[in-house]
Amino acid sequence: MTNVNEIIVPKNGYANLINDYMFKRVFGSEECKDILISFLNHVLDDKKVEDVVFLPTEHLGPTEDDRSAVFDIACRTSSGDEFIVEMQNAAQPFFKDRSLFYTSYPIINQAALAKEKYFEEHGNTIGFTWNFRLKPVRFIAITKFKMDHAADWPSDKYHSSYHISEDNLGEFLNDKLQFIFLELARFNKSESELITPYDKWMYLFKNMADLKSKPDIFSEKEFNRLFEIAEFVNFTAEQYREYQKAEKMLYDYHNTLDYARRQGLEQGLQEGLAQGLEQGLEQGLEQGLEQGLREGLEQGKKEERLEIARRMLEVAMPIGQIVDLTGLSMEEIESL
């Protein structure tokens, strides 16, 4: 008799690379370090990563009241460059700001590392000074959604890279901070159109879970390894259980998001119309309706995020993750 709780691993098919468990296994484990190195080299183009050391992904603020940060992947190369690699499945308020905030942790930590090294060499920290010479910090995000850009941004430009540069002449202040975004929602190439390694990575992020076998075009060593790791037949029961758990959380999140969006929009429109009609009597019907609808929709968006947070709490999602996903404050979430 088959145990209803028994995990049955599929005999064919591949895992979804943007699944939280799978993403961290492929890009954040010693088992697959060679795949991460290959990915970084393809993303950076002009840089060469020889080796990486994985770093802690949780960073606490200076005090209990300060915001903490939890990265998907954090690593340091043999040359000292630090990388944060994030998979972002859902759009959220101020994502670009959050990206900048995350890079502050490895930057600030470089002073502490310099002090530790001085202590190892001298046995004490007497006379220690730091010259502020930074190692590069690079933030890479793969997003499932389209990010906001200028109106003339090409709709199919899925790769963007940012540095700190002078406003008019474009001169780099320095090369110590870089942000790279890969937008899956802007990538629409078919298998026959894949040319660059970038194309191939983007295609697999979007389509690997739908493949029945490895296409011949993915002949490189790193892709052979990736297909081997991602094939369900090579999963243990425990690995598949963790994969399914992450799939369910993502499914629940999108269901919650859809429900809250519909509820929030409906409520926002109703409140906006009511408020607009009332203001319309005093200010002129057209202007009052326009303002009321705008304010009502904004209120609807806030209600939507609160409802999303409520449902995330119901499935025991960590509060820190809810804060990141919804943009709500810790206090707002704890009061639900």
Residue spans for each PLM region:
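Elongated, amphipathic alpha-helical interaction scaffolds
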Residues: 1-336
